[in-house]
Amino acid sequence: MPRRRVVGQRKILPDPKFHSELLAKFINVIMQDGKKSTAEKIIYKALDVVAEKKSENHLSILEAALDNVRPSVEVKSRRVGGSTYQVPCEVRPVRRNALAMRWLVEAARKRGEKSMALRLAGEMLDASENKGTAVKKREDVHRMAEANKAFAHYRW
């Protein structure tokens, strides 16, 4: 193994409008082809739509949506003696956030509303109320881990 030092995690600068690191990370997840300004417009428009529909703080709704989508366990493939087992493993906090954001964006992209901002707003509202495609994805992952609990002793 190389004897180089371990590279530390980069610090994410907070977004310019709300000064939130979580929102800055979410903007980076939505961004495609390096078009950050477009991603920012989509997120800020979605947050405005959420603010119109709900009287609560829109950042708290985003936080609630991500809380309801974050997985606590997932399954990883592990090969033992010629057969592959789906082994349930606990998810690290950084990965929980990353998976929640990714699933929320994927679910929003599959929705039928006219613009991406409306799709994202709809999915955030659904997820904050514990329904929607992203929450269903989390439930499926948890169900898969529960079904394979017998292989938990293969954890590494």
Swiss-Prot record:
| Keyword rRNA-binding attributed | yes
Q: Name one GO biological process term.
A: translation
Top-level taxon: Bacteria
Q: Which Pfam families match?
A: Ribosomal_S7
Q: Which GO terms describe its molecular function?
A: rRNA binding; structural constituent of ribosome; tRNA binding
**A Gene Ontology cellular-component term:** small ribosomal subunit
Which InterPro entries does the entry mention? Ribosomal_uS7 (IPR000235), Ribosomal_uS7_bac/org-type (IPR005717), Ribosomal_uS7_CS (IPR020606), Ribosomal_uS7_dom (IPR023798), Ribosomal_uS7_dom_sf (IPR036823)
What does the subunit comment say?
Part of the 30S ribosomal subunit. Contacts proteins S9 and S11.
Q: What is this protein called?
A: Small ribosomal subunit protein uS7
Give the species this sequence originates from.
Shewanella frigidimarina (strain NCIMB 400)
Source species taxonomy: Bacteria, Pseudomonadati, Pseudomonadota, Gammaproteobacteria, Alteromonadales
